[in-house]
Amino acid sequence: MSSGRIVQIIGAVIDVEFPREAVPKVYDALSVDGTETTLEVQQQLGDGVVRTIAMGSTEGLKRGLGVTDNGEPIQVPVGTKTLGRIMDVLGRPIDEAGPIGEEERMPIHRAAPTYADQAATNELLETGIKVIDLVCPFAKGGKVGLFGGAGVGKTVNMMELIRNIAIEHSGFSVFAGVGERTREGNDFYHEMKDSNVLDKVSLVYGQMNEPPGNRLRVALTGLTMAEKFRDEGRDVLFFVDNIYRYTLAGTEVSALLGRMPSAVGYQPTLAEEMGVLQERITSTKTGSITSVQAVYVPADDLTDPSPATTFAHLDSTVSLSRDIASKGIYPAIDPLDSTSRQLDPLVIGQEHYDIARGVQTVLQRFKELKDIIAILGMDELSEDDKLIVSRARKIERYLSQPFFVAEVFTGSPGKYVSLKDTLAGFKGILGGDYDHIPEQDFYMKGSIDEVIEAYNKRSK
């Protein structure tokens, strides 16, 4: 273990001078003497100087302070001892519940599984959310992205998915909070505690107020914990909220390291950094990682380089729409914009495929008719088109659903709808079985039985 000293501090970037024969390797962890600050080597500048990123605040550091090379990358605790605990980017507990007591630590930088080790599956993962199970079903061991602008419900959807899948699915989950609000992290912890699933979830937080080094590496910390569970032969759920903040932290670090920015000011290594993370989130022959990632879309522009780069790595994309949210339909998922590789008759079966495509066809036709309705009014439509509009409005409302995690805000109990009930409901609407029921009875209901019950109660 060699020793050096700090020669320059610029925000979160610190230059450290070492003897020329003992320069640390890139990604080695360094400890600043007399503090709890850890640095990670990013560049070797020559003459024994390395440029590092601080994993934590640089307040109180000054030139001349001694630094020790740990000789290895950042190591974090892994295994079952991490379950039920909240940790920071270095794997230190931040929940005031004593030491982790881990039996093993692993480096956060690892190679992705080789092509020969990877394994794909077509097994579906039921979420209990109608619109997702219908038009963009999730695969076990697949990658899912929740795309949406500010305030359309990414985190609420993520929390509902965690609640539904973590409770129905008996395996372990890892949640990485990357650059999100501390309040949301706190809410999430208590939500897990109240649902009695905290002992199956490892939580890793690097929140908005943390330096860019923490936000850049916290996703890798969470992923390392998930990889350990997978390599033990388990099926793991890995949740990331928010992958955009990971990119943003990379942009901040890149600028501080003096790299020339590329399109829209992002780092020139955007695709590579995203690939390094995403290629490790994969299923092997020993176990699977099913990942759900929230992706913030800046200014609702899906062509922005950050969400556009993320798209390439996903199996299912769930797109949240501000227009749907403005109608008061939650979850505000756009069934015409959301896609899944699983939406294939060979995977989900012909009946499910036909119902999903039927729903999308009716909604697409309704979208085309909106301009005519706005100019000429409903009366000018043919009888067939009037029927399509009527069914489309019912489908739109029936795609809404009360969430368990939103009970405290809405006052209405959450609903978990099985795939069988979801398909039966939409098949009935498309077949005209419920043409006599007014559209308001379809709003915020679970299964179709609740719609019929509400109609019968009102018509008495």
Curated annotation (Swiss-Prot):
Function of the protein: Produces ATP from ADP in the presence of a proton gradient across the membrane. The catalytic sites are hosted primarily by the beta subunits.
Q: What name has this protein been given in UniProt? A: ATP synthase subunit beta
Q: How does it sit in the membrane?
A: Peripheral membrane protein
Q: Which GO terms describe its cellular component?
A: plasma membrane; proton-transporting ATP synthase complex
Reactions listed under catalytic activity: ATP + H2O + 4 H(+)(in) = ADP + phosphate + 5 H(+)(out)
Q: Which SUPFAM superfamilies match?
A: C-terminal domain of alpha and beta subunits of F1 ATP synthase, N-terminal domain of alpha and beta subunits of F1 ATP synthase, P-loop containing nucleoside triphosphate hydrolases
Is this entry keyworded Cell inner membrane? yes
Alphabetical list of SMART domains matching this protein: AAA
Q: Where does ATP bind?
A: G148, G149, A150, G151, V152, G153, K154, T155
Q: Which gene name does the record give?
A: atpD
Q: Determine if Nucleus is one of this entry's keywords.
A: no
Family affiliation: Belongs to the ATPase alpha/beta chains family.
Enzyme Commission number(s) of this protein: 7.1.2.2
* GO molecular function ontology, one term from the record: ATP hydrolysis activity
* Subunit text: F-type ATPases have 2 components, CF(1) - the catalytic core - and CF(0) - the membrane proton channel. CF(1) has five subunits: alpha(3), beta(3), gamma(1), delta(1), epsilon(1). CF(0) has three main subunits: a(1), b(2) and c(9-12). The alpha and beta chains form an alternating ring which encloses part of the gamma chain. CF(1) is attached to CF(0) by a central stalk formed by the gamma and epsilon chains, while a peripheral stalk is formed by the delta and b chains.
Give the top-rank taxon of the lineage listed in the UniProt record for this protein: Bacteria
What Gene3D superfamilies has UniProt attached to this entry?
2.40.10.170, Bovine Mitochondrial F1-atpase, Atp Synthase Beta Chain, Chain D, domain 3, P-loop containing nucleotide triphosphate hydrolases
Where, subcellularly, is it found?
Cell inner membrane
> Which UniProt keywords are listed?
ATP synthesis, ATP-binding, Cell inner membrane, Cell membrane, CF(1), Hydrogen ion transport, Ion transport, Membrane, Nucleotide-binding, Translocase, Transport
Q: Quote the InterPro entries the UniProt record gives.
A: AAA+_ATPase (IPR003593), ATP-synt_VA_C (IPR055190), ATP_synth_F1_bsu (IPR005722), ATPase_a/bsu_AS (IPR020003), ATPase_alpha/beta_chains (IPR050053), ATPase_F1/V1/A1_a/bsu_N (IPR004100), ATPase_F1/V1/A1_a/bsu_N_sf (IPR036121), ATPase_F1/V1/A1_a/bsu_nucl-bd (IPR000194)
